């Protein structure tokens, strides 16, 4: 069964780009534009992995992950952070991020990071 990835990105063009490539790799993608929407989405359906921007309106990626990781069902979900500012890497790692990719986003790096934590074979099974 295909794995589900939650994409949290406030920039619509970036969100569409990520969705396009993840769908093409065989994943199910749910996309939202901020941390509040992500928290609500995770209550409805627990994703297998989260790809999240750090700097977003309403609730940033760090705040969102801190809240989500406090839930037992979410504590082991891998998180890949995306940001234009690499200074928050240590904070992201403390919150349980498994990868920290900088913008401008290299699609190949994102797909490699996702496949590392959700192998493509599993996504297409």
Regions found by a protein language model. Name each.
Residues 34-37, 60-66:
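Acidic catalytic/metal-coordinating carboxylates
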Residues 56:
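Receiver (REC) domain active-site loop signature in two-component systems and cognate sites
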Residues 9, 83:
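Conserved acidic carboxylate
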Residues 26-33, 41:
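Short hydrophobic/Thr-rich beta-strand motif most characteristic of the beta2 strand and flanking loop
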Residues 16, 63, 85-102, 111-112, ...:
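Alpha4 helix (beta4-alpha4-beta5 surface) of REC/receiver domains from two-component response regulators
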Residues 16-24:
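Charged docking surfaces used in two-component/phosphorelay signaling
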Residues 45-51:
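Active-site beta3 strand of CheY-like receiver
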Residues 106:
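Receiver (REC) domain switch/active-site region of two-component response regulators
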């Amino acid at each position: 069964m295909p794995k589900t990835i939650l994409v949290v990105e406030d920039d619509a063009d970036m969100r569409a780009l990520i969705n396009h490539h993840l769908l093409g790799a065989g994943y199910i993608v749910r996309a939202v534009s901020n941390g509040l929407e992500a928290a609500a989405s995770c209550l409805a359906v627990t994703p297998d992995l989260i790809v999240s921007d750090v700097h977003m309106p309403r609730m940033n990626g760090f705040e969102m992950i801190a809240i989500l990781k406090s839930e037992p069902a979410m504590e082991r979900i891998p998180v890949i952070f995306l940001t234009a500012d690499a200074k928050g890497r240590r904070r992201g790692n403390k919150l349980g991020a498994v990868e920290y990719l900088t913008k401008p986003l290299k699609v190949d790096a994102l797909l490699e990071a996702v496949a590392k934590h959700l192998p493509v074979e599993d996504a297409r099974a």
